UniProtKB/Swiss-Prot annotation:
GO cellular component annotations of the record: mismatch repair complex
Domain of life: Bacteria
One term of GO molecular function: ATP-dependent DNA damage sensor activity
Gene name per UniProt: mutL
Function: This protein is involved in the repair of mismatches in DNA. It is required for dam-dependent methyl-directed DNA mismatch repair. May act as a 'molecular matchmaker', a protein that promotes the formation of a stable complex between two or more DNA-binding proteins in an ATP-dependent manner without itself being part of a final effector complex.
Protein name according to UniProt: DNA mismatch repair protein MutL
Ranges of biased composition (kind: Basic and acidic residues): 407-421
Disulfide cross-links: none
Statement: the UniProt record of this protein carries the keyword Membrane: no
Source organism of this protein record: Geobacillus kaustophilus (strain HTA426)
Family recorded in the similarity comment: Belongs to the DNA mismatch repair MutL/HexB family.
PROSITE patterns from the UniProt entry: DNA_MISMATCH_REPAIR_1 (PS00058)
Gene Ontology BP terms: mismatch repair
NCBIfam families reported in the protein's UniProt record: mutl (TIGR00585), PRK00095.1-3 (NF000950)
Region (Disordered): 361-386, 407-431
Length: 630
């Protein structure tokens, strides 16, 4: 008798549940996605003990007929695809027909559903076996409760985390589904306490406000981009609004929230040099494309996807983020922690008039160049002390209506106060700013501790980190100077020797041509060593060995060398080494030239490491600190 036998359905479902149902959050995801596929507009999720004790999902969707109820718990039974061609044009969130039987096999399930055109149906299942079947009220929609998860697989229970951790995973799933479907009203409750409530208005900003708070939602910057194959829309946080992990980046493809490492890298490339190391933005991107261009049938959980034109999509995402930042002045503003008050009637408006000192030619090299020492025209203007404190109408989430009169009044009130946390932009703000216009003219008035430059204009006071400012100036200079990899090489007086184990030596020897194309020529020297007698001229002095070792490591790991990345690292290194340091006092003309050189850079707001360069104290905020407005 043969040893191979067919598994019974219950055992097969338990095995499938190992991939589909990893934790309570997996059940929440599958049930809510079914509700969305059923065209629900209101979905309520109730959890007890983070879903381990009970998960209940109630929707007002299409519901099911009695016969469909029974088939729904059969393996590979689905209403969402019919033949193999449908696999390449999937528009629904579910399609595999595995979720419900897998969930039912490791829990107790009670399902009540109806189409609204007759009596409903109620099913009770335990461990995948049907316990009871009866008629129920004919309410349109579905009410499904999953209890005692993993009751018959105690080994799985051992791997569950704390209630707090499991609840966090479940809430994260609902948050991302709510972002992906802003036209659906979601309500998530745990032990009777509401954790999330969205209004289903279709405005993603309202969902962002419900998840991250109204203040964060107000600061989010809208982005959009389009190509022949892709349409991208979403919101990104300014560089000063960051988090400690990538968990706040939400990606949605054709209404399905997904995970994609290449897209994550494309987003981070868009923020390049704008974020400090270890900090990540808040991002929501919705990407629409022909279903033929994306494969969602990679894993039973349907979170990982593959794109047919991945490089094109990544480039579009990166460019969209960069374009959004090029349209804005990203100077953080410092505000006084006090309620906005109306100025006293006797407080007169003051006038800003600055007499420009024509700077002399610099004796020290601060990277300004001739343009930085050109005299500037005097800047005069009136900056009223009074800032109206009239209430501004907002919607229920605390977000200004960008098309209403209240938003226009608010914009008028803030003329002259360019902020890093912009209000929701109007369509007229889509014009690109020239590099120098992104940073207003600044007039130095001194230094603080020989480290920070104090400058002024009609908008208030500015503090500039002089080291970070020249880092940015130097970085853009060296990045352009290095250019493309050159064939010019610098001969070494003393050759560099690199030794490797025998296995790595053979792999490196096989990739010598790749390194030679980059200007690094490896000469075999003995059984396990190479000599390098020259290097490209763009290598920073004193860092030759380190860069060559990194190039060899890239060859070992990826069989290729990313010259662009190496040049980028070299530019950052040289910009930092050659920048003025803290506690270095500068003359007035040197301060002036440094600020003008900073204005000419393409990104004058952060250093190459992502740290802020400049902070703004508005005139109004300063007057509040001194109680000149009461």
């Amino acid at each position: 008798m043969g040893r191979i036998r067919k598994l019974d359905d219950l055992l097969a479902n338990k095995i499938a549940a190992g991939e589909v149902v990893e934790r309570p959050a997996s059940v929440v995801k599958e049930l809510v996605e079914n509700a969305i596929d059923a065209h629900s507009t209101v979905i309520n999720i109730e959890l007890e003990e983070a879903g381990m004790a009970k998960i209940r999902v109630i929707d007002n969707g299409d519901g099911m007929e009695e016969d469909d109820c029974l088939l729904a718990f059969e393996r590979h039974a689905t209403s969402k695809i019919h033949d193999e061609h449908d696999l390449f044009r999937i528009r629904t969130l579910g399609f595999r027909g595995e979720a419900l039987p897998s969930i039912a096999s490791v829990s107790e399930v009670e399902l009540t559903t109806g189409t609204g055109s007759g009596p409903g149906t109620k099913l009770v299942l335990q461990g995948g076996a049907l316990v009871s079947r009866e008629r129920a009220a004919g309410r349109k929609g579905t009410d499904i409760t999953v209890s005692n998860l993993f009751f018959n697989t105690p080994a799985r229970l051992k791997y569950m985390k704390t209630i707090h951790t499991e609840l966090g995973h479940a809430a994260d799933v609902v948050n991302r589904l709510a972002l992906a479907h802003p036209d659906v009203s979601f309500r998530l409750r745990h032990q009777g306490k509401t954790l999330l409530a969205t209004n289903g208005s279709g405005d993603v900003r309202h969902v962002l406000a419900a998840i991250y708070g109204a203040e964060t939602a107000r600061q989010m910057i809208p982005i959009e981009a389009e190509s022949l194959d892709f349409t991208i829309r979403g919101y990104i946080s300014p560089p000063d609004v960051t988090r400690a992990s990538r968990n706040y980046i939400s990606l949605v493809v054709n209404g399905r929230y997904v995970r994609s490492v290449p897209l994550m890298k494309a987003i981070e490339a868009g923020y390049h040099t704008l974020l400090p190391i270890g900090r990540y933005p808040i991002v929501f991107l919705s990407i629409e494309m022909d279903p033929v261009l994306v494969d969602v049938n990679v894993h039973p959980a349907k979170l990982e996807v593959r794109f047919s034109k991945e490089a094109e999509l990544n480039e579009l995402v990166t460019d969209a983020i960069r374009q959004a930042f090029r349209k804005r002045t990203l100077i953080p503003s410092v505000s006084a922690d006090s309620k906005m008050a109306k100025p006293k009637a006797e407080q007169a408006a003051w006038t800003f008039t600055h007499r420009v000192r024509e700077p002399s030619v610099l004796s020290s090299d601060i990277g300004g160049g001739e343009d930085a020492t050109a005299p500037l025209a005097p800047l005069t203007g009136d900056a009223p002390a009074e800032r109206p404190s009239a209430a501004v109408q907002t919607d229920e989430c605390g977000i200004l209506d960008e098309h209403g009169p209240a938003f226009e009044r608010k914009q008028e009130e803030e003329v002259g106060e360019e902020r890093c946390s912009p209000r929701l932009p109007t369509d007229g703000q889509a014009e690109d700013k020239a590099a120098a216009d992104r940073l207003p003219p600044l007039y130095p008035i001194g230094q603080l501790h020989g480290t920070y430059i104090l400058a002024e204009n009609e908008h208030g006071l500015y503090m500039i980190d002089q080291h970070a400012a020249q880092e940015r100036i130097n970085y853009e200079y060296f990045r352009e100077k290095l250019g493309e990899a050159t064939k010019e090489v610098q001969e070494l007086l003393v050759p560099l020797m690199f030794e490797y184990p025998a296995d790595e030596y053979e792999r490196i020897a096989a990739c010598r041509d790749e390194l030679a194309r980059c200007g690094v020529f490896l000469e075999p020297f003995g059984p396990r060593a190479f000599l390098v007698r020259s290097h490209p001229t763009w290598f920073p002095k004193g860092r030759e060995r380190e860069i060559i070792e990194e190039m060899i490591e890239q060859v070992l790991a990826a069989k290729t060398v990313d010259i662009k990345q190496l040049r980028e690292q070299a530019a950052i290194l040289m910009s930092c080494k050659r920048a003025i340091k803290a506690n270095q006092h500068l003359r007035q003309d040197e301060l002036f030239a440094l600020l003008e050189a900073l204005r000419q850079t393409t990104d004058p707001f952060t250093c190459p490491h992502g740290r802020p360069i400049i902070v703004h104290f508005s005139t109004y905020e300063i007057e509040k600190l001194f109680k000149r407005v009461m």
